[in-house]
Amino acid sequence: MLTLIKNADVYSPDHIGLKDILITDKRIAAIEDHIDITAPGLHVIDANGKIAVPGFIDSHVHILGGGGEGSYRTRTPELQLTDATLGGVTTLVGVIGTDGTTRTMPALIAKARALEEEGITCYVHTGSYQVPVKTLTGKIEDDLILIDRVIGAGEIAISDHRSSQPTAQELAKIASAARIGGMLSGKAGIVNIHVGDSHDHLSLIEVVVETTDIPIKQFYPTHINRNPHLFEAGIHYAKKGGYVDFTTSSIPKFLEEGEVKCSVALKRMLEAGVDVSQITFTSDGQASLPDFNADGELIGLQLGKVMSLYEAVREAVTDEGIDLAAAIRVITKNPAQILKLSSKGEIAVGKDADIVLLQQSDFSIDSVFAMGQVMVGNNQAVIKGTFE
């Protein structure tokens, strides 16, 4: 199948100007000022007045559903294909959260494969909040080495009343296993860390880094914008060389209580001197957004949305004045590099043909291509999930 996108203003994510993009099968075959070809079945798309950016990577999504903190009826539903594609997301990383009992690794991997059959790319992390880590094979290393979809471990919870209260030694052993498994499989072997509201912040990771040979970039902490004091701790952590991830799914009450809006968080991090390559956004899609009282009792619940991922990036551009090339990196090139997804995150020859076309006038999503296939056109789903 041949697709030719003509006259797009391309952000690779770096701005490279007006280009034609030729897609053959599932990859980008050429990017030139002008491509003029004829071939049977050639699909030509006029992207005049549109911006082409890499397909978005959402590396923290509860594809199986999450939640459950308010008992069984609060378990959230599985992700549907268009929950991702209508938001421009072409690559996902599935995680298990609080509930590592009824949400299992076999089910997580099966769901990832189902999403891939429907047209997008999906990886997973092994484990959940819990320590010891519940893996598929019995060992973190073995999951990474033997299971193609597994690229890291997590989300391991720290600084949270819902965590297993892991020690620095336990976290070090998890990171070591993930690192070795990653080395032997050619994967990132990253440890995705859920950071809660506790004033312990990122100290557990910092102790591991200070007392072992494990590098700070083995860890990928998320929810760093959840409150002002964690955000400030995140700035100091990032200045030591660590990655920081901001969660885009939110509700007004969280913002009123001090959560730092992602667009604002990005601007403040950059102003503080943190390199943009260390910063990512993820949606925490399909997670419950629980509100607890002072006694740790659940008093409210809403659902995280993958659609919020690009909405936050768009706000960073339109509301905070951040350059599109910098803003779009946090959901494209940065996660691709952190997770060692070498065929993702950039519009470049040889990369997977994951491309989003934006309206130049307002940065809204017009079209989405995943592995060369049109998933969204004119902001309408072209391909839907099996049960949608």
Stretch-by-stretch model annotation:
Residues 1-3, 9-53:
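Histidine-rich, glycine-flanked metal-binding segment
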Residues 8, 21, 26, 49, ...:
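Divalent metal-coordination and catalytic microenvironments
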Residues 177-290, 298-299:
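Active-site core of metal-dependent hydrolases
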